[in-house]
């Protein structure tokens, strides 16, 4: 099969078309602006898979309809998924704009006095607004000289934020969500909404019964040599935690080995179902070798699978991590309990940062008073106003232990192309594999248990669907918190201590849902959330606006909120603008 190419960024230099001196005097400056933009983006950005970002520049500057059409023809042939129009001068507004209705687009109008780049920017944005095709405005804060080829810091920030979000939009389009199973324990997020995926994300849903996973395992539709490699890797790297089951439910060595074997097979088969595997064609399984073109997946598990077979905890944890028996590699996006809406939040976070994601229950709010009563410990520092216990048996990537290190030696989660094998090994060494609790998982399994290091910046997100409104996005920036070991042990043993934990302290604003930590917990829209490394809420906001998903809750500084220019015409309060604009324009891929 022909490999699907990655989306590219189109750069559109537009120019005043008047010959006999005007256009000629601007050609070099305008094209250099396009080249500088392309150089910035290719230097600073990568696709989530680690591949370099490519920019495609129009063959000529664009002065009118003919050159705009020629540019569009070139872009259409090269899989351009988003565009940035650049100019230092006046040009002819609606004659030169990008008219593709679903392609994210921005315009950078140079802030200079010699030629009115800002005037074109305003005229072009007015045309976009009038035609119902929103575009992002980029305009430097300070005036630059005409011969200044540098890109100011504020312009660079907007170019990169737009491009990150636009690449996420383009990368999701045309892919699928693999729904492996159905609704898990009545969890609304696992009632997979095909219209949401199709209309807002441009994706399809591939619904597959869990018996397909059973069939692949039982009929050996996998690479048997790879299974042996996976088992050897687990034997070398897995540390096992205590078995907290009653004696009658504890498994002997042979039974435990069978559970481990099937857990690793589940990871292999789910991966093959998502992306395909040419090795399957070699054993005569050509249809299965193709996969389902899935950029994200979810596994129902509970209870129709887990009452009889090993749970998905090991498979999900390994797939979501940036490494396995094949070494360091791109993480997959697999939502536990087939919570497709949390899966979408994971997908967004992964596309924006290139990193693995932490799937968790938003389990418990611990007030400072409650912790002091139970443990005698008085919270301070980042945790002084209370903390939220994020914990779940399944999809937390092992990267979430934060045993990787940034350039300053601080704990973090890095994109896979920056992770060393030593850092991957450190994450494995920080993880224990605990036998699943029989009362919950009768078929057995192993849950990963680790504790996220403290002081790490995170952004917690969640997508919810509201009847009559559609999808909404929640965002809470904050930090992981490290508690004294004895305090952690006391709190952790009050719940399921065989699962991975992140203690999370959201950044408070003193207003609305961020009045206090309790309010964050009380306003969270579902039982699950996702942690993405870094304070990247602004990127999520920009991405959501491209997809026309309003943000119902966030604690991002107002100066960092970046949405299409037309949002400003939808009222004076920026969050109300977001709702009205998203309702006005409707989902990006209207159906």
UniProtKB/Swiss-Prot annotation:
Mn(2+) binds at residues 337, 361, 528. Its EC number is 5.3.1.25. Its cofactor is Mn(2+). GO terms for molecular function: arabinose isomerase activity; L-fucose isomerase activity; manganese ion binding. Pathway: Carbohydrate degradation; L-fucose degradation; L-lactaldehyde and glycerone phosphate from L-fucose: step 1/3. Belongs to the L-fucose isomerase family. PANTHER family: L-FUCOSE ISOMERASE. Converts the aldose L-fucose into the corresponding ketose L-fuculose. Homohexamer. This is L-fucose isomerase. The gene is fucI.
